[in-house]
Every structure is written in structure tokens, then in C-alpha cells.
């Protein structure tokens, strides 16, 4: 049991280190623009090209690496992230920095898909949602914690200090994985064609559409939350920052809660989630911008729902393609990214 818990902990922190590299740079884009003498739109490519790399690699890279020793694959991915982050510290021009961002992006879904698969396989089937929830907590923490830490480091020192932080975290996880993760050979590798054949199943495509819609419904609106709080609710900047932090922290709590709910009553959880989300948005539309206590309560509920959402999305594809876990988790990552992109575009109108 202790070894199992240690494995889940290392996987969760490993995912945190990957997401920390992806999301941590968001808050320091202006500093990157200043350091490399580019405009903010060009600096934004450090985020958008990374996300594009993840979306492209999602269905392919986990599939390609599914037959190799899982520990070796984890070390490869963490090694690539560490080397690229370390080289980014001394990157002399913006084009080189972009390359050093794009290369690890293609390995991002490999580690994340692997983490979900290994976590689910390390416990009894009925406990798999709880184990996966631990990994999603690492995802949420990477999105929430990475941004403020990198922001503080870059503001206190310079942009390169944030890159040192990214390299240090992935490097530490490389060492911990090497030392404490047992050898994880794939005893019965599944043929690539057999894994791809899951795409012939209509429920798989229904699950993909559901993930796109669910993730779009959460992040499509969340991406405009700061603007909503400023322009509609007319809140001061300090309070907006506090509410965004509360939302992020409750995402972590929601991930934990979502795992327990899916383990106990998966059908009810999946069916009620869209209804709860619709109700929340209706209340937000009707009175969220006028009543601060109601707005605060809705953001609390929204943060929890956001965490539950990630677990439901992974669960939907895992159920309909359980015989190809690495490939299905790669599809989940791609569908989630497409949902975020589509939701953001539609909500912007």
C-alpha cells in the first residue's frame, strides 16, 4: 500500500511539473516580450504553440510509446522537459526559445496519458476513479500554483529565473522517478492497429464530443472570468486576484471530490454535472454581477465543478476504450484541449 501511494504521489507531482512548464509562463509573457524585444502577440506564441503541440501529439504520441517500459518513457519525457527548460534559461533569441517550448509540448501528452493509465492500473478497478483523481489534482495544482510562483520569480529576479524553476521541478521529478518508481514493463503490448480500432466504436466518438462540450463549457467561460469580474461586477484588482486563486484551489478540491463521486455513483455524477453547470451559469447571468455574496458563492461552486469536470472527462473515454488506456487518455487530452479552444472562441462572441 505504501509503495502504491508513493507511486501515485510521484505521478501526481510529475504531472504537476509538466503542467507547471506549460501554464507557468502565462503570467510572465510581458516579461518575455520585454526581454526578447517582441510584441505581446508574438510572446503569446509561447503558450499557443505549446497548446497546439499538445493537441497534435495527443492521439499519436501516447499510442507510439504505449509498448515501451513505462518507467523508461517517464524518464525520457522528464529528461526532455528538463533539458529544454535548462536551455531556455540561456536562450539567446526568441526563435530558439519557441523551439525549446514546442519540442517538450509533443511529449506532454505522453507523460499525462501514461500517468492516468498507470494510476488506474495500480488499484482495483472500482478504485480507479480515485487514483485518477490524484493525478488530476496534480494537473490542477500545476495550473494554479505554477503561474504565481513563476510570476514572483520573474518579477523578483528576471525571466530566466522562472525557466530555472521549471527546469528544477522537472529535474527533481526525473531523479525521484529514477530512484523510487519501480520498473514498469509492458508485458502484453497491444498492437497499434488494435488500439486505433477503438475509433470504430460510436460510443468513443460520443465520448469525444461530450468531452469537447463539457470542457468547453467550463474553460470557455472561465477564460473570460477576470474580464467579467472587472467589467460587469466592477471589482478591484486585488479582489479579482483573490477570487481567481480561490477558484484554482477549489479546482484541486473538486478533483478529489470528483474521484470519490465517480467511484461511488458514476452514473448519477455524470448525469447531474451538466445540470449543475447550467444552473450555475443561469444564476451567474441573472444576478452574479450585482450581488457580491452570490458571486463569491458561485465562484466557489464553479471551482469545485471545474475539478469534477476533469475527472468526468477522463472517465468517459476510459469507460468506452478501457482496452486501450494510453490511446484513450491521449484522445481525452486532445478532446479537452479542443474543447477549451472552441469554448473560448464561441464564448468570446
Q: What are the language-model segments listed below?
A:
Residues 37, 69, 90-96, 287-289:
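Helix-breaking motifs and short loop linkers at transmembrane-helix boundaries and internal kinks
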Residues 58-69, 254-266:
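Helix-to-loop junctions at the C-terminal end of transmembrane segments
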Amino acid at each position: 500500500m505504501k509503495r502504491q501511494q508513493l507511486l501515485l504521489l510521484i505521478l501526481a507531482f510529475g504531472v504537476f511539473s509538466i503542467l507547471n512548464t506549460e501554464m507557468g509562463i502565462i503570467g510572465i509573457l510581458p516579461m518575455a516580450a520585454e526581454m526578447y524585444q517582441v510584441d505581446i502577440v508574438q510572446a503569446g506564441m509561447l503558450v499557443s504553440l505549446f497548446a497546439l503541440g499538445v493537441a497534435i501529439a495527443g492521439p499519436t504520441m501516447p499510442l507510439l510509446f504505449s509498448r515501451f517500459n513505462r518507467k523508461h518513457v517517464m524518464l525520457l519525457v522528464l529528461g526532455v522537459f528538463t533539458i529544454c527548460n535548462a536551455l531556455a534559461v540561456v536562450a539567446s533569441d526568441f526563435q530558439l526559445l519557441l523551439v525549446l517550448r514546442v519540442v517538450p509540448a509533443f511529449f506532454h501528452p505522453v507523460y499525462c496519458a501514461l500517468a492516468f493509465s498507470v494510476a488506474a492500473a495500480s488499484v482495483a478497478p472500482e478504485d480507479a476513479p480515485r487514483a485518477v483523481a490524484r493525478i488530476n489534482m496534480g494537473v490542477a495544482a500545476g495550473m494554479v500554483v505554477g503561474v504565481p510562483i513563476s510570476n514572483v520569480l520573474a518579477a523578483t529576479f528576471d525571466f530566466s529565473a522562472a525557466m530555472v524553476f521549471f527546469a528544477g521541478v522537472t529535474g527533481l521529478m526525473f531523479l525521484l522517478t529514477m530512484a523510487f518508481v519501480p520498473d514498469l514493463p509492458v508485458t502484453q503490448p497491444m498492437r497499434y492497429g488494435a488500439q486505433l480500432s477503438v475509433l470504430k466504436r460510436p460510443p468513443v466518438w460520443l465520448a469525444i464530443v461530450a468531452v469537447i462540450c463539457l470542457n468547453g463549457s467550463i474553460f470557455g467561460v472561465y477564460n473570460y472570468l477576470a474580464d467579467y469580474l472587472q467589467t460587469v461586477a466592477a471589482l478591484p484588482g486585488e479582489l479579482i486576484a483573490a477570487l481567481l486563486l480561490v477558484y484554482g484551489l477549489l479546482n484541486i478540491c473538486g478533483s478529489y471530490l470528483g474521484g470519490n463521486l465517480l467511484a461511488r455513483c458514476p452514473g448519477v455524477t455524470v448525469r447531474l454535472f451538466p445540470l449543475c453547470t447550467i444552473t450555475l451559469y443561469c444564476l451567474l447571468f441573472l444576478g452574479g454581477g450585482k450581488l457580491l455574496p452570490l458571486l463569491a458563492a458561485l465562484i466557489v461552486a464553479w471551482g469545485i465543478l471545474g475539478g469534477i469536470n476533469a475527472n468526468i472527462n477522463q472517465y468517459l473515454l476510459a469507460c468506452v476504450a478501457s482496452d486501450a488506456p494510453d490511446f484513450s487518455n491521449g484522445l481525452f487530452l486532445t478532446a479537452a484541449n479542443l474543447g477549451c479552444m472552441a469554448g473560448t472562441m464561441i464564448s468570446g462572441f
